[in-house]
């Protein structure tokens, strides 16, 4: 299985890659891609796209998702993001709607969030792979152990990071983050089922930009 990951992450996570659970996870995932050709998302080379798109030291904002989109050609390894030629999913539509409302800007009608990642937004799903049409199909195979460790490493080794936790699943990660050195923003999930329960009107993006400015970090263009 081809895995692409940025060099600084390779160094930071090398101990994790050597652990027994991770080796078992890799073997499981390799077998899934081999036996279910074209049915596991994202493509192998994009599994670690969130890491490959952003060096560790350049992280400014962390947005946590659950697992990748499970439709064909949707998932591109970045939480909430889809390939540029794919229709924008409802949750991402609501994210754009909140950005436009709170920042008074016009978002680009393109669901590929690589443009955010390259500016310092770490778009991390807790589970990094999924089987077609089976949401959460790769739950409890080891990904959560790995990504929980990633969150703890960010919290421990960086300062003044904005963590956006949307929905009960993401909010459950709050205990992994040191609130004394980072900004934790919590609200409902941007899904159409819950966006009106807090997400729309949360002002998370304006709060994030204000926090970055207060800590002398360059702003992010959320268009």
Swiss-Prot record:
Catalytic activity: Hydrolyzes single-stranded DNA or mismatched double-stranded DNA and polynucleotides, releasing free uracil
A single GO cellular-component term on record: cytoplasm
Active site: 67
Alphabetized UniProt keyword annotations: Cytoplasm, DNA damage, DNA repair, Hydrolase
Pfam name, any one: UDG
Keyword DNA repair: yes
GO aspect biological process, one term: base-excision repair, AP site formation via deaminated base removal
Keyword Nucleotide-binding tagged: no
Annotated InterPro entries: UDG_fam1, Ura-DNA_Glyclase_AS, Uracil-DNA_glycosylase-like, Uracil-DNA_glycosylase-like_sf
Entry EC number(s): 3.2.2.27
Function: Excises uracil residues from the DNA which can arise as a result of misincorporation of dUMP residues by DNA polymerase or due to deamination of cytosine.
PANTHER family listed in its UniProt record: URACIL-DNA GLYCOSYLASE (PTHR11264:SF0)
Name of this chain's protein: Uracil-DNA glycosylase
């Amino acid at each position: 299985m081809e895995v692409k990951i940025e060099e600084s992450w390779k160094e930071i996570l090398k101990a994790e890659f050597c652990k027994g659970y991770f080796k078992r996870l890799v073997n499981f995932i390799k077998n899934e891609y081999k036996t279910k050709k074209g049915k596991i998302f994202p493509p192998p080379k994009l599994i670690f796209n969130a890491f490959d798109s952003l060096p560790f030291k350049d992280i400014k904002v962390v947005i946590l998702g659950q697992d990748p989109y499970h439709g064909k050609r949707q998932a591109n390894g970045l939480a909430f993001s889809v390939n540029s030629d794919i229709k924008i999913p409802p949750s991402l539509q609501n994210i754009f709607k909140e950005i436009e409302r709170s920042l008074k800007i016009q978002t680009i009608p393109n669901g590929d969030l690589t443009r955010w990642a390259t500016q310092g937004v770490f778009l991390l799903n807790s589970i990094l792979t999924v089987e077609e049409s089976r949401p959460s199909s790769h739950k409890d195979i080891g990904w959560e152990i790995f990504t929980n460790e990633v969150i703890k490493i960010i919290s421990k080794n960086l300062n003044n990071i904005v963590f956006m936790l949307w929905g009960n699943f993401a909010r459950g990660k709050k205990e992994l983050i040191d609130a004394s050195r980072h900004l934790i923003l919590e609200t409902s999930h941007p899904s159409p089922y819950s966006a009106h329960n807090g997400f729309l009107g949360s002002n998370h993006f304006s709060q994030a930009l204000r926090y970055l400015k207060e800590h002398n970090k360059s702003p992010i263009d959320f268009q």
